[in-house]
Amino acid sequence: MFRSQFTTLLGLFSGAWLPTGSGRPGAPATPVQSGTAINQSWTLDPLVPISALGSWEAFLGLQNKQQGTGELQGGGQRVAAGVPLPLAPQEVLQETCKALSFVQVISRPGCTSARVLNHLCFGRCSSFYIPSSDPTPVVFCNSCVPARKRWTSVTLWCGAGQLASPRRVRISTVLVQKCQCRPKL
């Protein structure tokens, strides 16, 4: 995920104002104390991950249902009772996800092998799990996965060393070009 997406996700955790679709911060109807969570409707910035917002809304819904608390605001929106979440911004922004080069050996029984320069995705991505009495807990997991990839064909020579002449066999493989932290699907 990009730094701006994590900043937005952290804003969801801390109860900070989220950007509206116009790019200007939207003010809540009542002042918010630091470290509390609010359940409000916002026009999403295109960079806000939908899965993060859905998980957050589900979390707030669970809080309202379990606690039976919450106050209605002027617009009929429900504010959850204060839910402190002790997260530091640097903890959320410490994601690393890189495409590391390696030589992949493509082979098949009875064929010569071919070597292809490829990339593997390696890194550490954010996740959270919110326990509840509901059978389906709120889970948000990111994984370091390919963000850009392409298919390529590799030619292997098969049957070499036998009486028959060798034949070409084409095999398709994925070449990873870029990696990024993204939600698991």
From Swiss-Prot:
Cystine residue pairs: C97-C144, C111-C158, C121-C179, C125-C181
Tissue expression profile of the protein: Expressed throughout the neural retina and in the photoreceptor nuclear layer. In the retina, widely expressed in inner nuclear layer, as well as in the ganglion cell layer.
A Gene Ontology cellular-component term: extracellular region
Gene disruption: observed consequences: Knockout animals are born at the expected Mendelian rate. However over a third of the homozygous mice die within the first 48 hours after birth, mostly due to cardiac defects. A proportion of surviving animals display multiple laterality defects including randomization of the left-right axis, left pulmonary isomerism thoracic situs inversus and cardiovascular malformations. Knockout animals that do not display a laterality phenotype show a massive enlargement of the ventricular myocardium and a left ventricular systolic dysfunction.
Stimuli inducing this protein: Down-regulation during the establishment of embryonic left-right axis could be due to translation repression involving BICC1 and possibly DICER1 and/or transcript degradation, involving BICC1 and the CCR4-NOT complex. Attenuated DAND5 expression lifts repression of NODAL and defines leftness by induction of the left lateral plate mesoderm NODAL signaling cascade.
Main location: secreted
Gene3D superfamilies: Cystine-knot cytokines
Compartments, record wording: Secreted
UniProt GO molecular function: morphogen activity
Residues in CTCK domain copies: 97-182
Keywords: Disulfide bond, Glycoprotein, Secreted, Signal
Glycosylation sites: N39
Pfam families, alphabetized: DAN
BP GO terms, sorted: atrial septum development; determination of heart left/right asymmetry; determination of left/right asymmetry in lateral mesoderm; determination of left/right symmetry; negative regulation of BMP signaling pathway; negative regulation of nodal signaling pathway; negative regulation of transforming growth factor beta receptor signaling pathway; regulation of transforming growth factor beta receptor signaling pathway
InterPro entries documented for this protein: Cerberus, Cys_knot_C, Cystine-knot_cytokine, DAN
Function: Antagonist of the extracellular signaling protein NODAL, which is required for correct left-right patterning during embryonic development. Antagonist of BMP4 signaling. Antagonist of TGF-beta signaling. Independently of its role in left-right axis establishment, plays a role during heart development, possibly through the regulation of TGF-beta/Nodal signaling pathway. Displays anti-angiogenic activity by inhibiting endothelial sprouting, migration, and proliferation. Once internalized by endothelial cells, may alter their redox and glycolytic balance.
Similarity section: Belongs to the DAN family.
Listed name of the protein: DAN domain family member 5
The species this protein was found in: Mus musculus (Mouse)
Gene this chain is encoded by: Dand5
